[in-house]
Amino acid sequence: DLLLNSIMGMRGLKPTLAAIDSGKQIALANKETLVAGGEIVMQKVAEKGTTILPVDSEHSAIFQCLQGGVKPKKLLLTASGGPFFGKKRFELNKITPEEALKHPNWSMGKKITIDSSTLMNKGLELIEAVHLFSVAPENIEVIIHRESVIHSMVEYADGAVIAQLAKPDMRLCIQYALTYPNRLQSPVQGIDFLKIGSLTFAEPDEETFTLLPLARNAIKKGGNIPAAVNGANESAVSLFLEKKISYLDIFDLVAQAAENAVYIKKPSLDDILQTDKAAREFVRAKTR
């Protein structure tokens, strides 16, 4: 039996744990489950002998590139860069929700589209990858790839790099998780490489898009800090969409909430839930 968890946000954590307890294989589209409670979730997965199949395009790509069973040297997470690629912080001061919701390549929900624009989505995906693939955060590199054709890559010890390429269409990732290990006919058309012509790559601007390094530092510290970052971000994005805070306030409030969190090295599920709640309340209190 397979359960597809596509619940948005931290609300997906408890259903994921319940599904693991029931012994079900899980197709996971809810990245916050692993961001906030990754250690608890993956420990329970090991205990129950079940499997998590990633639905996110980047993690699905890595999962496919790892099918040879050889330990990777490095994971390379690709990012579109969002609608504000190339802009500096001072240019983001008056960004509206309507502008931030115009993603150049993907059609997604509002929250994940805002996260993509701030690069927090890539930060959350980095944390998710640490747990899913047992790779240290320093061995995960984020690369801006504007075309969103390469969905991620894996580098091995011999220098070989394996990449998964497809059109930016979530139907393919969802289908692969639901039909794994089989590959069935898909409604997604193949790539016409001659029309694409070239693929480009760039380094992310972490001085402007500070939530990416913040997320990386959160998983390096570990414990309940990723849960604080995630909870604060969910709250801040919601406030931005309600036009109660500015775009740059998202960056500042999440950083402040992470700094304010009381560190717990080995958090229980209750600790994770309380950390999430406290981070959300911190953000809300700052905006009253």
Which residues fall in each region the model found?
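Catalytic, metal-anchored helix/loop core of enzyme active sites in primary metabolism
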Residues: D1-R288
